[in-house]
């Protein structure tokens, strides 16, 4: 039977009704989570369809085991994102037969044993790409690569060090599209590695390592030496008793560099590695393949090579009864029941993931390539399949911590609020582990469970002290899952739960947005006119749960409030002095450390700081994070991303301002030869290529065409730049050739670019080239291209490819005027490294 499909408008309008008029939540759901095929057909009308899809699939797995949950019971937990929310890949992929992809949100890879050869480095590169094409975020560690200058037995004679390979892995990430996005990558290195300083500095140079997050693994000895001003020994190999390279460094100086770079550019993040390993339950089985080596891209799941994790969030706000009233209380009994069910659902999702990997095997085996070509991907998924089934790792987390505290009448960041949060997370830990023990009775423990191995683990002993009976049950029956808990970022999840994100406080309870209006329309109130003459009306937006507080306390949400009245409202609410800008940052770090004691994996938190904070504050926050028992920490200083060095040449302020304000010169007569970049993109299922002609480093013209077809452009994949040459026939007809150097240094020419292109696309490309030639600002060209109303689906996807090709030329820090952040709704998007990054909430959108 043919499945019913829906138009975008049908799905959007149904979702808008589902989310009670929340446009942002509706668009996020339709764009990211509704089931679609590769032709863009939409098979789900609203999140209700999605929740039945997930409930039916999980119920199918439940039926294999005793005491099975029904589809209806599961649906009731998922409906309206009220209690339990599978995050990201599980939400998209469970029951979705239109894509062959993993359900895992994150992976870590890395070869066993001596893996510093060129072959090993390239193998990791290939594995990284294979995972990213199946929707996975990937992390891996570089501590195994020899430091720069080390002797090697090849024609180079000495090692290049790890920085060139950072760039390689970063570039691979940028190549891979996951549903229109770049891949996500975390690169880590031990501070003990002699090249760690170069690693820490790698992203401070313009355009370098733009496709990866970087974090440095800090041990306790380094932290102690940095604080006390003592020397610290770096060596390679980092764990060797007889290192081939060793040197003493000034720990304080390197620590200051870490702090400075984090203050300047928000990276590197820091991972307190001794804390991670000491607290890690899976590392009790390190000799059996569960030695933690790196983390996923957001840092909340430290993992061993070829292990993976799936994420789920419990909506804490939904357990507050009578929210925002003096009678408010937290329903711990219902909460305990649901935590147990969340752990159970996550175990079911592991079975669903193993089925998905079996489909990946079938796809690889049916591909026409030889096993020599596809063997790496097959072997990679075999290792992941084995490790996933062996440990059965889960990632049960939370969202809406900030709203939960406000609904209870507690102010985020106070001692009273932190104590309550600690109680909630202790409850999660005990009930998730109790559920895992009960599943061990019904379904069997994870294969290598051994109570003797875990007896000295601090996390396990915390559980033992809190609930001795649970510990004895675990010793007797084992546990279903090697590790259970995390706290991950919940960006789009919290948009759909309509709550605060993760364990974060509310960003702002009330803020203003602008919408464009026609000043000639009746009943229009014009509050603002921009420099182009466009008129805007300002309107107040209330955070969803602040709106609930208003209604509970008798304030009319439909009234038009003055700013003074809004300030008075906020001051009366539990959100007062509890926003991300108001919260005491040191107290927030201490809160993270206290909650971390009840989370067996890690917590992903970014401390958002105003632009004017000092480096000393960043130093204090990082040191406090280490002392408080946090496993990692990241800071983001407002505006710091745009503040990364744009070039290695220094300019004084006056020169910088002149450069920024001076418009590029219009050159009406095109030079005979222009330098050019090559940008590849997908147009539906076809591979296309764009040639972007550059004048003074700015796009001057663009040619696009089908790549590798019989009449199209045959161009080696290694070619990323060249020259576009304008010439004339004897009759005066002009034509354009593309010239590049091949790997052997010979000039190769592709003749007649304009003759190789479909005339329909050619005309649009001429239009775009025309506005580029007259030096319209690139961000405005992108806006123009985006606004083209085109009927053909192919033309529209081509248009999107052209937008992506041009975005890389927008100067970092340029505002995307009139464009709202899909995450927080603010018009605070700036271009950074070809991506749009929100200065308000830090979310990014690439491609």
Task: Give the ranges of each region predicted by the language model.
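Conserved, charged catalytic cores of large soluble enzymes
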Residues: 2-71, 154-168, 178-290, 321-326, ...
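Catalytic alpha/beta core of large soluble enzyme barrels
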Residues: 23, 299-301, 350-354, 460, ...
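Function-dense linear segments that define catalytic or interfacial modules
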Residues: 57-64, 77-154, 162-165, 176-179, ...
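Short, Gly/Pro- and small/polar-rich lid/capping loops
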Residues: 471-473, 647-694
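Short, cysteine/histidine-rich loop/knuckle motifs that typically chelate Zn2+
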Residues: 822-826, 840
């Amino acid at each position: 039977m043919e499945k019913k499909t829906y138009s975008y408008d049908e799905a959007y309008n149904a979702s808008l009704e589902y989310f009670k008029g929340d446009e942002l939540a509706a668009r996020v759901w339709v764009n990211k989570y509704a089931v679609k095929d590769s032709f863009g057909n939409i098979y789900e009308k609203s999140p209700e369809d999605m929740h039945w899809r997930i409930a039916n699939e999980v119920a199918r797995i439940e039926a294999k085991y005793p005491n099975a949950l029904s589809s209806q019971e599961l649906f009731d937990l998922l409906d309206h994102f009220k209690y339990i929310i599978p995050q990201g890949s599980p939400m998209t992929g469970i029951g979705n037969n239109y894509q062959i992809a993993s359900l895992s949100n994150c992976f870590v890879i890395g070869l066993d044993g001596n893996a510093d050869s060129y072959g090993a480095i390239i193998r990791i590169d290939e594995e990284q790409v294979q995972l990213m094409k199946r929707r996975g975020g990937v992390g891996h560690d570089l501590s195994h690569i020899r430091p720069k200058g080390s002797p090697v037995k090849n024609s180079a004679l000495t090692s290049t060090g790890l920085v060139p390979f950072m760039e390689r892995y970063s570039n691979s990430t940028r190549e891979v599209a996951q549903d229109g996005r770049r891949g996500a990558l975390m690169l880590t290195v031990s501070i003990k590695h002699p090249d760690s300083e170069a690693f820490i500095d790698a992203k401070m140079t313009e355009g370098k390592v733009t496709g990866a997050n970087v974090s440095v693994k800090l041990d306790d000895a380094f932290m102690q030496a940095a604080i006390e001003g003592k020397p610290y020994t770096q060596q390679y190999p980092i764990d060797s008793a007889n290192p081939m390279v060793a040197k003493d460094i000034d720990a304080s100086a390197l620590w200051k560099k870490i702090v400075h770079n984090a203050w300047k550019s928000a990276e590197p993040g820091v991972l307190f590695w001794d804390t991670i390993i000491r607290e890690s339950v899976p590392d009790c089985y390190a000799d059996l393949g569960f030695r933690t080596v790196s983390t996923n891209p957001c840092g909340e799941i430290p993992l061993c090579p070829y292990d993976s994790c799936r994420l789920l969030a419990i909506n804490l706000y939904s357990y507050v009864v009578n929210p925002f009233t003096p009678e408010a209380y937290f329903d711990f009994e219902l909460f305990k029941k649901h935590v147990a069910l969340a752990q159970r659902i996550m175990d079911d999702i592991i079975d669903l993931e193993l089925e998905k990997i079996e489909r990946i095997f079938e796809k690889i085996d049916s591909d026409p390539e030889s096993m020599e070509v596809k063997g790496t991907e097959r072997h990679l998924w075999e290792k992941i399949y084995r490790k996933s089934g062996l440990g059965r790792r889960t990632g049960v987390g939370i969202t809406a911590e900030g709203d939960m505290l406000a609904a209870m009448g507690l102010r985020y960041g106070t001692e009273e609020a932190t104590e309550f949060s600690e109680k909630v997370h202790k409850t999660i830990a005990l009930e998730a582990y109790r559920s895992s023990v009960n599943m061990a009775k019904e379904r069997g423990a994870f294969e290598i469970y051994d109570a003797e191995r875990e007896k000295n683990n601090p996390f396990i002993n915390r559980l033992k002290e809190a609930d001795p009976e649970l510990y004895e049950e675990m010793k007797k029956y084992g546990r279903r899952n090697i590790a259970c808990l995390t706290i991950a970022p919940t960006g789009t999840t919290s948009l759909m739960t309509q709550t605060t994100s993760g364990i974060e406080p509310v960003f702002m309870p009330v803020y203003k947005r602008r919408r464009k209006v026609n000043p000639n329309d009746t009943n229009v109130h014009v509050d603002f006119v921009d420099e182009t003459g466009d008129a805007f009306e300002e309107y107040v937006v209330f955070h969803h749960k602040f709106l609930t507080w208003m209604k509970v306390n008798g304030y009319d949400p439909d009234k038009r409030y003055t700013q003074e009245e809004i300030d008075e409202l906020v001051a009366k609410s539990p959100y007062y002095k509890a926003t991300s800008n108001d919260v005491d940052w040191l107290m927030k770090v201490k809160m993270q450390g206290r909650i971390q004691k009840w989370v067996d994996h890690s917590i992903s938190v970014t401390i958002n700081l105003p632009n004017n904070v000092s480096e000393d504050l960043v130093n204090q926050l990082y040191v406090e994070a280490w002392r408080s028992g946090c496993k990692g920490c990241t800071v983001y200083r407002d505006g710091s991303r745009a503040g990364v060095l744009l070039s290695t040449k220094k300019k004084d302020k006056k020169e910088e301002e002149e450069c920024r304000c001076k418009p590029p010169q219009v050159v009406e007569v095109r030079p005979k030869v222009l330098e050019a970049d090559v940008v590849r993109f997908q147009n539906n299922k076809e591979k296309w290529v764009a040639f972007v002609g550059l004048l003074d480093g700015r796009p001057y013209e663009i040619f696009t065409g089908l790549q590798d077809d019989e009449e199209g452009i045959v161009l080696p994949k290694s070619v990323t730049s060249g020259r576009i040459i304008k010439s004339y026939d004897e009759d005066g007809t002009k034509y354009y050739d593309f010239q590049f150097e091949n790997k052997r240094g010979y000039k190769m020419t592709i003749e007649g670019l304009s003759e190789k292109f479909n005339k329909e696309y050619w005309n649009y490309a001429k239009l775009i080239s025309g506005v580029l030639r007259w030096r319209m600002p690139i961000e405005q060209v992108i806006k123009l291209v985006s606004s083209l109303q085109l009927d053909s689906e192919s033309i529209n996807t081509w248009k999107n490819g052209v937008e992506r090709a041009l975005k890389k030329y927008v100067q970092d820090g340029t505002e995307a005027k009139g464009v709202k952040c899909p995450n927080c709704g603010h018009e605070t998007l700036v271009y950074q490294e070809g991506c749009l990054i929100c200065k308000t909430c830090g979310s990014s959108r690439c491609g």
